[in-house]
Amino acid sequence: MARVTVEDAVNQIGNRFDMILVAARRARQIAVQGKDPMVEEENDKPTVIALREIELGLVTADTLDADERQTVREREAAEIAAVAAIAEGRNTI
């Protein structure tokens, strides 16, 4: 198991409290949403992976927000396409 000091992660984010929020969001993405880690897993838990990504500057609150907006746009586009397909099916009857 990797030993992670949070000082580098805190320095990347700015303060300890925001770092915790960013790390929790990223760990949840990895563990629950199935997002791929940006660093080697090395048999680490999602929280450790999230902290390592933050330390390297790969993850910030802004990158998480942008990723979330992209996910919402993709979901909305899929819903619109599904509705259009249903409407198209009704028009051909």
Swiss-Prot record:
Name under which the protein is recorded: DNA-directed RNA polymerase subunit omega
Keywords: DNA-directed RNA polymerase, Nucleotidyltransferase, Transcription, Transferase
Source lineage: Bacteria, Pseudomonadati, Pseudomonadota, Gammaproteobacteria, Alteromonadales
Catalysed reactions listed for this entry: RNA(n) + a ribonucleoside 5'-triphosphate = RNA(n+1) + diphosphate
Annotated function: Promotes RNA polymerase assembly. Latches the N- and C-terminal regions of the beta' subunit thereby facilitating its interaction with the beta and alpha subunits.
GO cellular component terms attached to this protein's record: DNA-directed RNA polymerase complex
Pfam family, one: RNA_pol_Rpb6
Species, as recorded: Shewanella loihica (strain ATCC BAA-1088 / PV-4)
Enzyme class: transferase
